[in-house]
Amino acid sequence: MTRIKRGYIARRRRTKLRLFASSFRGAHSRLTRTMTQQRIRALVSAHRDRGKRKRDFRRLWITRINAVIHEMGVFYSYNRFIHNLYKKQLLLNRKILAQIALLNRSCLYTISNEIKE
């Protein structure tokens, strides 16, 4: 019986895996089994942290808006400010409001005066 040489498919798969894990430290970039485990772990972390990043930015925007509202001396809190925005049907999201709060506080002050009851 003649010897059958293995194909290139497994080698190609491992090469692709090795390129992905080349920046990992120690055995995580050298041994195939640990490379596979670390790749799965890295992709899970990336997937989880994409959602976390969205939550973190939303918290940051809310904090910035709240800080500027309290600094301006407006007599209501952040949640009442957002509630009044919705009642007056001003469609400004928190990202835009935070940018206005940082760059142009007088504009945010006029918005708050417009929606105040």
Curated annotation (Swiss-Prot):
One of its GO terms (biological process) is translation. Keywords: Chloroplast, Plastid, Ribonucleoprotein, Ribosomal protein, RNA-binding, rRNA-binding. Transmembrane segments: none annotated. It holds the Pfam family Ribosomal_L20. One of its GO terms (molecular function) is structural constituent of ribosome. InterPro entries: Ribosomal_bL20, RIBOSOMAL_L20_CS, Ribosomal_protein_bL20_C. The keyword Nucleotide-binding does not apply. GO terms for cellular component: chloroplast; ribonucleoprotein complex; ribosome. It is found in: Plastid, Chloroplast. It comes from the Eukaryota. Binds directly to 23S ribosomal RNA and is necessary for the in vitro assembly process of the 50S ribosomal subunit. It is not involved in the protein synthesizing functions of that subunit. Belongs to the bacterial ribosomal protein bL20 family. This is Large ribosomal subunit protein bL20c.
